[in-house]
């Protein structure tokens, strides 16, 4: 084949645009003559589209990491940042699976051995368009993470922060408000927050047992919603 082939399978593989983060990555690599072969890429899509969890960005990041690890392409730090930024602002976060802060000046700081939290991730049947949610932003908040510190991963700090896009999404989609209210009263989570521009809502728990019990109860009461438990890195 004269073109790269990107195949998606899995529960959330339907209706993925042919112009996506992975095709964007390959277009960039070919334009810069960093690759000269054609590839068949198979991706199992386990993360829902339009959930605000950056699944597409992480797909591209992991393929780029693989190419670097296998010496298929040789890149310096500046080139990696350039490629990541071209694909999407959060792609750079996926280049190293650890706790990271991306500052407003596009600098990244990574931290090891942060406290692990257990998460219950819930998504209704509808998704949120990032472009649409951002179009309702009237005023941007002052940057809070220009001076990253490890304490920003402490529970007390995280509990006091907020997602500036949450108010917009919850106003547009009242169902999200109901989910958040339900989760806040489900087995005493540390805090509950919307992901990115939505539509997934995450409840954070101190123990796996609390999280598992909460998941069981949520699934019992909301059979039509996607719900999965996980943990922070």
What is each residue range found by the language model?
Residues 31-40, 66-87, 207-218:
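Phosphate-handling active-site elements
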Residues 51-77, 93:
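DPxDG-like acidic metal-binding loop motif
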Residues 1-29:
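Glycine-rich, flexible beta-strand/loop modules in the N-terminal catalytic cores of phosphate-handling
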Residues 20-42, 181-183:
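Short, contiguous, well-ordered secondary-structure segments
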Residues 198-201:
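Conserved glycine-rich beta-strand-loop-beta hairpin in the small C-terminal domain of fold type I
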Residues 6, 20, 94-96, 100-191, ...:
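Conserved, helical-rich catalytic subdomain that frames metal- and/or nucleotide-binding sites
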Residues 39-52, 192:
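Short pre-catalytic strand/loop immediately N-terminal to key active-site residues, enriched for Gly-Thr
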């Amino acid at each position: 084949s004269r073109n790269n082939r990107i195949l998606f399978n899995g529960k959330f593989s339907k209706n993925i645009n042919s112009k996506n983060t992975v095709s964007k990555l390959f277009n960039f690599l070919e334009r810069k003559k960093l690759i000269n072969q054609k590839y068949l890429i198979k991706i199992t899509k386990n993360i829902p589209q339009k959930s605000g969890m950056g699944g597409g960005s992480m797909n591209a990041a992991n393929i780029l990491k693989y190419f670097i690890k296998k010496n298929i392409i040789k890149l310096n730090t500046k080139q990696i940042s350039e490629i990541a930024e071209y694909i999407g602002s959060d792609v750079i976060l996926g280049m190293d699976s650890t706790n990271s802060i991306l500052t407003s000046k596009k600098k990244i700081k990574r931290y090891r051995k942060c406290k692990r939290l257990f998460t219950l991730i819930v998504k209704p049947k509808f998704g949120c368009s990032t472009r649409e949610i951002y179009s309702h932003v009237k005023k941007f908040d002052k940057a809070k993470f220009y001076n990253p510190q490890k304490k920003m991963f402490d529970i007390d700090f995280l509990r006091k922060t907020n997602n500036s896009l949450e108010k917009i999404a919850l106003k547009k989609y009242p169902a999200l408000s109901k989910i958040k209210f339900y989760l806040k009263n489900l087995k005493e989570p540390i805090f509950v927050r919307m992901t990115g521009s939505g539509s997934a809502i995450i409840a954070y728990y101190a123990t796996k047992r609390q999280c598992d019990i909460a998941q069981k109860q949520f699934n019992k009461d909301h059979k039509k919603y996607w719900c999965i438990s996980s943990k922070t890195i």
